[in-house]
């Protein structure tokens, strides 16, 4: 039976987070609703440490999305709607973590395996988002993860050295929040290895999937390269990747990679 005080705590905390998200426009209405549902699931399974890890991801990512936003927009690489994210983004980034949280509650014999999978999944998508937002501030050339050819800023599969600084920042924040706020005792060394590997490998897997699989289109009207299947009011022409395999699918690949890496570290280290 769920502790009624935990339910009350979760309701109050998520209500406060919802107001902050709405006031800062970090998520739109649908995105906020899905995020609250995900937060409730995590709160009642993994506990407050899991929710605080998700909140850290959302807050820091939203802040870095807005840093240098005009410059990002000028090169066509800024998040749409002023950086406000929707429900598909929430599911792409948080769906795997939600499944890991539920499995943590159901599988008594392998609870810590799923706890590490949860942490690794969130750390990976956090790292990927920071790699993008910090990397877009770089003045150096963007390189493709495969072949190292020159890429345009924001192009799927593009990487920068500064972007990997963002990965390290996300990993350290994930490590600190997990170590400080999870009620279950976590081995500091194993946790550090987990978040570093899950963050780095997850973000790299995102770049590989972005270059090989993510759909990239060319607008029939203006000729611009875009991730949108429709541009300037007309259907775009697919020039690379798998039709329909969008950024949210790539995010899910990143999240799943982080979860698998973290579970492997827990199992074998």
Task: Please name every model-derived segment.
Residues 1-269:
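Hydrophobic alpha-helical transmembrane segments
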């Amino acid at each position: 039976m769920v502790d009624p005080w935990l339910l009350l705590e979760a309701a109050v905390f998520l209500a406060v987070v919802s107001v902050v998200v709405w006031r800062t426009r970090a998520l739109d209405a649908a995105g906020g609703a899905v995020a609250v549902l995900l937060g409730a699931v995590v709160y009642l399974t993994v506990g407050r440490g899991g929710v605080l890890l998700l909140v850290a991801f959302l807050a820091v990512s939203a802040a870095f999305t807005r840093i240098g936003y005009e410059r990002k927009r000028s090169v066509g690489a800024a998040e749409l709607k002023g950086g406000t994210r929707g429900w598909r983004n929430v599911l792409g980034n948080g769906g795997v973590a939600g499944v890991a949280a539920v499995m943590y509650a159901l599988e008594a014999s392998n609870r810590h395996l799923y706890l590490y999978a949860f942490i690794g999944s969130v750390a990976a998508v956090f790292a990927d988002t920071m790699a993008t937002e910090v990397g877009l501030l770089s003045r150096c050339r963007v390189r493709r993860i495969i072949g190292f050819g020159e890429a345009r800023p924001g192009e799927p599969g593009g990487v920068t050295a500064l972007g990997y600084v963002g990965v390290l920042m996300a990993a350290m924040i994930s490590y600190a929040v997990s170590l400080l706020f999870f009620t279950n005792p976590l081995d500091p060394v194993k946790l550090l290895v987990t978040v570093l590997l899950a963050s780095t490998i997850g973000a790299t897997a995102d770049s590989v999937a972005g270059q090989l699989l993510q759909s990239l289109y060319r607008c029939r009207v203006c000729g611009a390269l875009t991730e949108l299947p429709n541009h300037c009011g007309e259907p775009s022409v697919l020039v690379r990747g798998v039709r329909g395999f969008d950024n949210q699918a790539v995010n899910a690949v990143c999240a799943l990679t982080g979860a698998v890496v973290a579970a492997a570290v827990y199992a074998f280290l």
